[in-house]
Amino acid sequence: MNKFLIIDGLNLVRRIYAAIPDETDMQSLTERVSSACTKLLRVHRPTHVAIVWDGDEISWRKQLYPDYKKGRKPMPEPLAQGLVALQDHLTAMHIGSIYAAAEADDVIATLAIKTAKAQGEAIIVSTDKGFSQLNHRQISQWDHFNQQYLDIAALEQKLGVERSQFLDLMALAGDSGNKIPGIAGIGPKSAAELLKTFRSLPTLFSSLSNLGAKQAKKLAEGKEMARLSYKLAQLQTDLPLNINLKDFRVIDSLPEKTINQD
């Protein structure tokens, strides 16, 4: 069985970069990233590995909602200037890169789902909890910095909803980190309580008459914003990848087919 280690490139690199005292010390960054990748390979023993990078195009999410991720700090100039050399170094280590047009998240999600559907195992290396929506038994998420898998049960307990309701929760309460708006006046706790009672957004919005007038008014007025927020939070899992698995092979394995689903 194929085991694909999928690394969220900038999520890993920027966290490592932030811990380097001298922001111009790209040699130290290269060494630390190389060490991290070597450790990831040693710990997980994948058959395949890829590191996925964000691109420069404006994402479809930002086109849909211009405030999406508004206020995010730009990449530090030394890192921006040294990124290509770092990517080349990783290629020399036989860690293949995949370059997204805009956000890496949708490419990572697509690759993970396609791997799982092909009876393989996908391990996403990222601290971004947005990947927790990929509810498939063959997909897991590894936090390199805490050296542990994402604990879905603990996350469910923290959020107060089941995994299948994570997107509904973000649709109602938003996501401040990504500037996903949600419905004005509906916070995470009240959103979780609503989902405990009504289970899903369609059921909730068809049951507003069962709520108090004030809360029902908020939800009715915010219905379209909830739909927008859901769409912004939901990862795309059906992008055409057009990659050949042999280009990302770590160890000898049986011949692979090309992933090229439209």
Curated annotation (Swiss-Prot):
Record InterPro entries: 5-3_exonucl_a-hlix_arch_N (IPR020046), 5-3_exonuclease (IPR002421), 5-3_exonuclease_C_sf (IPR036279), DNA_polI_H3TH (IPR020045), FEN (IPR038969), HhH2 (IPR008918), PIN-like_dom_sf (IPR029060), Xni (IPR022895)
CDD domains: H3TH_53EXO, PIN_53EXO
Pfam families reported for this sequence: 5_3_exonuc, 5_3_exonuc_N
Leader peptide range in chain numbering: none
Keywords per UniProt: DNA-binding, Endonuclease, Hydrolase, Magnesium, Metal-binding, Nuclease, Potassium
UniProt KW Nucleotide-binding keyword: no
Entry GO MF terms: 5'-3' exonuclease activity; 5'-flap endonuclease activity; DNA binding; magnesium ion binding; potassium ion binding
The protein, known as: Flap endonuclease Xni
